Amino acid sequence: MTMRKLKKYKPTKFRVRGSKYNKDAADFAVAFIESLCHTKGTWAGKKFELIDWQEQIIRDLFGILKSNGYRQFNTAYIEIPKKQGKSELAAAVALLLTCGDGEERAEVYGCAADRQQASIVFEVAADMVRMCPALNKRVKILASQKRIIYLPTNSFYQVLSA
C-alpha cells in the first residue's frame, strides 16, 4: 500500500499580515515526527510517515511564523474521523512540543473529557518515547502521574481531565 505523500505544499490562506512560511521550521517539525514510530495496529514499529493531509497540518502549524519569529498558530482545532490515527498524530505533536521545540520548561497539556480518554494519547506518546533510543535516554516517564519530562529542558507533557 502506497502512502499519499504531500507533493507540493501550499501554505494556508489563513495567515496574518506579515507572517511567512519558514521551510526550515516546517521541515524540522516533519522530520521530528517522522523519526518516531507508530505504536499500534498494522503500522506498529514502523516509522511515522505523514500522509498528505497530516503533513499539511504540521507544515501550517509549525512553519508559518509571524514577523517576530513566533509561530502564528498556538491553538488548532482539528476534526479527524475514527480510525485515522488521531492518537498517534496527537502524541507525536505533544512530543514535538515537549522535546523538539527547544523551549526551557515548556508545559504541554493533553486534555479530554475524562482521565481515561486523555490517557490514551499519553500511553501512545510514552510508547513512542520507549521506541526511540534518542528520546528514551533523555525522557523520564512518570506513568502514575501521566507525565512525560524531557530532562534537557525540564519541559513536560501532562494529562488533564475535565
What are these regions (language model features)?
Residues 2-162:
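Phosphate/NTP-binding elements of NTP-utilizing enzymes
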